[in-house]
Amino acid sequence: MAPNLRKSHPLLKMINNSLIDLPTPSNISAWWNFGSLLGICLATQILTGLLLAAHYTADTTLAFSSVAHTCRNVQHGWLIRNLHANGASFFFICIYLHIGRGLYYGSYLYKETWNTGVILLLTLMATAFVGYVLPWGQMSFWGATVITNLFSAVPYGGQTLVEWAWGGFSVDNPTLTRFFTLHFLLPFMIMGLTLIHLTFLHESGSNNPLGIVSNCDKIPFHPYFSLKDILGFTLMLLPLMTLALFSPNLLGDPENFTPANPLVTPPHIKPEWYFLFAYAILRSIPNKLGGVLALAASVLILFLAPLLHKSKQRTMTFRPFSQLLFWTLAANLLILTWVGSQPVEHPFIIIGQLASLTYFTILLILFPIIGALENKMLNY
């Protein structure tokens, strides 16, 4: 009998073992769809990004007008740009839901997979930040100035570090060109990291909603989950297309329609919505270095998730108190996101500080305590 090429060819064999004959737990829910959705987001962003880069000029005098030219004169340039800008938002929606799923179902106990995932998140955040600077509008310029300035909080070498990052004494042409370089490079780095992430995942196999070993009940990835993934793609690409075609500027800042002007500061500098929770945490501490450390901690805290797991059960499926805490954390993040978009004045300052405190308290203190408490409850 002739060997099946899909199973014998050196390259096809790898694809087969990852996407076709992969043994998958039969009970994984729609929460397991976000990994493949992130893959689609990455592919879409790289494709639209390459097409945009072909028409973009990384120069302070030309950047803004080159983006306007792309939207006005390039065939479907407006659509490519709108898909790219809003695709970033969908990328972050998917990654936040993917991380939330990981926290809820204890996926962080696959430490290598989890750690590469957190590194992927950090790389994605860096990519989105440098990308936002490229259109060289007011918010691009001032966002770059404010965020890069945070490095000056580093003791001793801070100022030198910032000037080195800027390539001068302020955000200017060298900054824009290096940000374009980074924005072009990082997505390919994300692609490489994604392969590592998947390699680690396929070492152990997928987790499942019950958090128990599922070797006795696995089904092939194709056709079951390949079809389920295609449904997921449709359900994500439909709202993306709707947003890009009907209200492409809904999530953007109107300030960015004004070309960058170093002499005029916008009344309220704020990042895109997906960074607002971290921005709120940064602002809640009235000290530069403290704020920077809190900002870094807000994301780096994810590395600690495996160490803070004290429960005998892997997932939160049968842990009502942990569930309550988890959804409190989710609501708290929404509050932080809202506070980050508000001006720094009376009610918002204290709300932001309380929400920041709650965020760290839940993750660092309450989750381990409740986990240990639920273990005790198993005895009764």
Swiss-Prot record:
Name a single GO biological process: mitochondrial electron transport, ubiquinol to cytochrome c
Protein name per its UniProtKB record: Cytochrome b
Which GO molecular-function terms appear in the entry? Answer: metal ion binding; ubiquinol-cytochrome-c reductase activity
Q: Report the record's disulfide bonds.
A: none
InterPro entries found in the cross-reference section: Cyt_b/b6_C, Cyt_b/b6_C_sf, Cyt_b/b6_N, Cytb/b6-like_sf, Cytochrome_b, Cytochrome_b_C_euk/bac, Cytochrome_b_N_euk/bac, Di-haem_cyt_TM
What quaternary arrangement does the UniProt entry report? The cytochrome bc1 complex contains 11 subunits: 3 respiratory subunits (MT-CYB, CYC1 and UQCRFS1), 2 core proteins (UQCRC1 and UQCRC2) and 6 low-molecular weight proteins (UQCRH/QCR6, UQCRB/QCR7, UQCRQ/QCR8, UQCR10/QCR9, UQCR11/QCR10 and a cleavage product of UQCRFS1). This cytochrome bc1 complex then forms a dimer.
**What species is this protein from?**
Antigone antigone (Sarus crane)
User: Anything else of interest in the record?
Assistant: Heme 1 (or BL or b562) is low-potential and absorbs at about 562 nm, and heme 2 (or BH or b566) is high-potential and absorbs at about 566 nm.
